[in-house]
């Protein structure tokens, strides 16, 4: 039985969501007694991390969109049963850096795969599990890619090599999802100063936990 809460963090490449999460968690631990788990997709457990390497390898430019989607789904399933569900059943507050919405935005809007197929596969992999809250960090594609290019410490992966048109379609996909699920997905302007972005994210998380 799930007694914990699931919060997912989403955004186009360069939105800074991972950095926000790193700063958000210590602040949250000062305010709640609940155990907190942070993890990521694809990855989080050994099998899923191996799949992550396959997906992001810059040499795998021939990867078919359906192959890409199925790899993400496989990584999601393993991560869920091995790490996420046990934590939720233990009553923990779980943060995942990317989850089901990424598939709709990237492989759906970005790659042009059918939304219905993606939703069915997500349902199959998660047994219908949905986040209690999704923090979507929005940033224009031009700004996001500029941030990536300016970050000398960030390792470039296969998805970073995509055209700006694909990144723009991904963003449009996210915005459509936010409009479709306004109660679950909150949109946060990630062009604002980092401290302000973290503060807004914290407010939304606390609102969920104190509701």
Curated annotation (Swiss-Prot):
Q: Which SUPFAM superfamilies does the annotation name? A: P-loop containing nucleoside triphosphate hydrolases (SSF52540)
Q: Does the keyword Transferase apply?
A: yes
Q: So what does this thing catalyse?
A: dTMP + ATP = dTDP + ADP
One Pfam family cited in the UniProt record for this chain = Thymidylate_kin
| Binding residue positions for ATP | 11-18
Q: Name one cellular component (GO) term.
A: cytosol
Which biological process terms from the Gene Ontology are attached to this UniProt entry?
A: dTDP biosynthetic process; dTTP biosynthetic process; dUDP biosynthetic process
The domain of life is Bacteria
Keywords, A to Z, come to:
ATP-binding, Kinase, Nucleotide biosynthesis, Nucleotide-binding, Transferase
Q: Name one GO molecular function term.
A: dTMP kinase activity
Q: What EC number(s) are associated with this protein in UniProt?
A: 2.7.4.9
Supply the HAMAP family for this chain: Thymidylate_kinase
Official protein name in the record: Thymidylate kinase
Per the UniProt record, the source organism is Streptococcus pyogenes serotype M49 (strain NZ131)
Gene encoding this polypeptide?
Answer: tmk
């Amino acid at each position: 039985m799930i007694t914990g809460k699931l919060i997912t963090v989403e955004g186009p490449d360069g939105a800074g969501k991972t950095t926000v999460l790193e700063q958000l968690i210590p602040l949250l631990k000062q305010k709640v007694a609940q155990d907190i788990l942070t993890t990521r997709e694809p990855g989080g457990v050994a099998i899923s991390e191996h799949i992550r390497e396959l997906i992001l390898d810059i040499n795998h430019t021939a990867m078919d969109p359906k192959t890409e989607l199925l790899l993400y789904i496989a990584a999601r399933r393993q991560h869920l049963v091995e790490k996420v569900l046990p934590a939720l059943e233990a009553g923990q507050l779980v943060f995942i850096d990317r989850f089901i919405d990424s598939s709709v935005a990237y492989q759906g809007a970005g790659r042009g795969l059918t939304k219905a197929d993606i939703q069915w596969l997500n349902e199959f992999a998660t047994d219908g599990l949905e986040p209690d809250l999704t923090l979507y960090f929005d940033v224009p594609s031009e700004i996001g890619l500029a941030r990536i290019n300016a970050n000398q410490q960030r390792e470039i992966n296969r998805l970073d090599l995509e055209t700006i048109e694909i990144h723009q379609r991904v963003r449009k996909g996210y915005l459509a999802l936010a409009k479709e699920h306004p109660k679950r997905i909150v949109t946060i302007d990630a062009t604002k100063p980092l401290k302000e972005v973290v503060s807004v994210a914290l407010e939304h998380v606390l609102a969920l936990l104190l509701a």
